[in-house]
Amino acid sequence: MAIKKLDDGRYEVDIRPTGRNGKRIRRKFDKKSEAVAFEKYTLYNHHNKEWLSKPTDKRRLSELTQIWWDLKGKHEEHGKSNLGKIEIFTKITNDPCAFQITKSLISQYCATRRSQGIKPSSINRDLTCISGMFTALIEAELFFGEHPIRGTKRLKEEKPETGYLTQEEIALLLAALDGDNKKIAILCLSTGARWGEAARLKAENIIHNRVTFVKTKTNKPRTVPISEAVAKMIADNKRGFLFPDADYPRFRRTMKAIKPDLPMGQATHALRHSFATHFMINGGSIITLQRILGHTRIEQTMVYAHFAPEYLQDAISLNPLRGGTEAESVHTVSTVE
C-alpha cells in the first residue's frame, strides 16, 4: 500500500514514483487527507515538470492494477470480473511496465487470444476494461503518461446470430415451466428484460403496473409498463426479492429442450430476443423498442428492424418484375414527327 496507518495513529506515505526499483519516498502525517494530498503532489510533480522530459513510468501493470483496485475497482459492481480480464492481459503480456504497453504489444495480445479461440467481442471487452483502469488512474492523478489504450483500434466483431421463439414455442415453454422460473419467463417476454435483471427485482421495483429494472447492464435504471395481470402474478402480496426460487440452470435445460437449435450462448437472451422480434412483427416502433430494451445506440436495436411488416416492402413493388415472375412488355414511343 502507498499509504498505511501506523500503530501510533499516524499515516505513512511510502511510494516509488518510477516503480518498485526507483527512488523510495517516505513521509509521515497526522491526518490521512494530508498523506493522500502529499502522495498526489509528489507523483504529479515528479511526472509533470514542464521544463524536463517526463520520466519513463517503469511501474509494472500489476502494480498499477493494485492501485486501481484499491482506488475504484473493488467498489464497482463488476469489479472482480474486470479485474479478471486485466489479470489475463497482464499474464499473457508478461506483466509489462507502463511504458511498454504499446499498440504493438496490444496487437500481439489480440493475436494470442484469437489463436486461443477467443471471440473478438471478448477481446474488445478486455481492452475496454484495461482502458477504463487507466482512465480512472489518470483522473485520480495517479498516472501521468499517455493513455496507452486510447486510440487503439478494436477488432471487428461478427454480428451474433439471434434466436427467438415462435408463438407455438412460447406456449410449449410456459407449459413446461413452473414457479418462479415461469414468472420470470412471463416477465421477460412482457418487457424484454434480461434474465439477470428480472431475477434481481424486488417488490418495491413494481409500482402502478410499471416495473423498474435497477441492476441493468448499462447501470442505468429503466422503467417498462406491464399489464395488471402480469403485475398481480409476480408482485401481489410480496416483499423483498420477487423470485427467490428462480433456478437458471433448470430454466436453461428446459429452454434447450423446447428450442434445441438455439444458437450457442443465446439461452439467457432468447426471451429478450423473442420480445423484440414479436414487438417489431406486430408493428412496433424501432425507437420505442430501443427505449424499452435500454440500448444506448440505435444500431444495437436495428438488428430487429427487418421483422417490421413494412420493412423494405418497396423492394417488391419497385423491382423490374413488379412482384411478378416475368418482365413487363416495354413499349418504345417514337418522338420523330
From Swiss-Prot:
Entry-linked InterPro entries: CB, DNA_brk_join_enz, Integrase-like_cat_sf, Integrase_catalytic, Tyrosine_recombinase_XerCD
Any idea of its EC number?
A: 2.7.7.-, 3.1.-.-
* Domain of life of the organism encoding this protein: Viruses
Active site, renumbered: 194, 217, 269, 272, 295, 304
The UniProt record lists the Tyr recombinase domain at 160-317
An annotated GO BP: establishment of integrated proviral latency
UniProt entry keywords in alphabetical sequence: DNA integration, DNA recombination, DNA-binding, Hydrolase, Transferase, Viral genome integration, Virus entry into host cell
Q: Where is the Core-binding (CB) domain?
A: 59-138
Which terms does the record give in the GO molecular function aspect? DNA binding; hydrolase activity; transferase activity
Q: What does this protein do?
A: Integrase is necessary for integration of the phage into the host genome by site-specific recombination.
The record's family statement is:
Belongs to the 'phage' integrase family.
Specify the protein name.
Integrase
Gene it is expressed from: int
